[in-house]
UniProtKB/Swiss-Prot annotation:
The keyword Lipid biosynthesis applies. Its main location: cytoplasm. GO terms for cellular component: cytoplasm; membrane. It catalyses: a (3R)-hydroxyacyl-[ACP] = a (2E)-enoyl-[ACP] + H2O. The active site is at H66. This is 3-hydroxyacyl-[acyl-carrier-protein] dehydratase FabZ. GO terms for molecular function: (3R)-hydroxyacyl-[acyl-carrier-protein] dehydratase activity. InterPro entries: FabA_FabZ, FabZ, HotDog_dom_sf. It is an enzyme of class 4 (lyase). Its EC number is 4.2.1.59. The keyword S-adenosyl-L-methionine does not apply. GO terms for biological process: fatty acid biosynthetic process; lipid A biosynthetic process. The lineage of its organism: Bacteria, Pseudomonadati, Pseudomonadota, Alphaproteobacteria, Acetobacterales.
Amino acid sequence: MDKEVEVPPAGDSPTCIEAIDVMRIMEAIPHRYPFLLIDRMVDIVLGSSAVGIKNVTASEPHFQGHFPARPVMPGVLIIEAMAQTAATLVVLTLGPAFEGKLVYFMTIDGAKFRRPVGPGDQLRIHVEKERSRANVWKFKGIARVDGVSVAEATFSAMIMG
């Protein structure tokens, strides 16, 4: 099991966390199976960026109907995985008082889906904060499989008390 590993800040640089496992993600956000769409996070820079990892498996419920002969992960679920990665980053940044709080989508802009994602793929979801003001955060997200971009979007969300 992965452990949360913090790297102390040097000067004014933000705090980094090497990796967190799914149990720590579930402490941060309220999502649960079958709608918890990230398995692990790595390369976390608090207040700035993170990478979420989703191991796509054939047993996921959406593949029963999307599409049985050629399973494709719905694009909206890839965007949701970006949002869950960003929400976890927000909670880790703001601290324990925000654990389990809801983070709601406000906008999704420029969503592009470049290639299908299916069973056996590993999504690496890179999110980077573009800006934040009070409880509203805006992110750019890019999902990749084997280093190739499969989806991207810019989105904003609000953390609710």
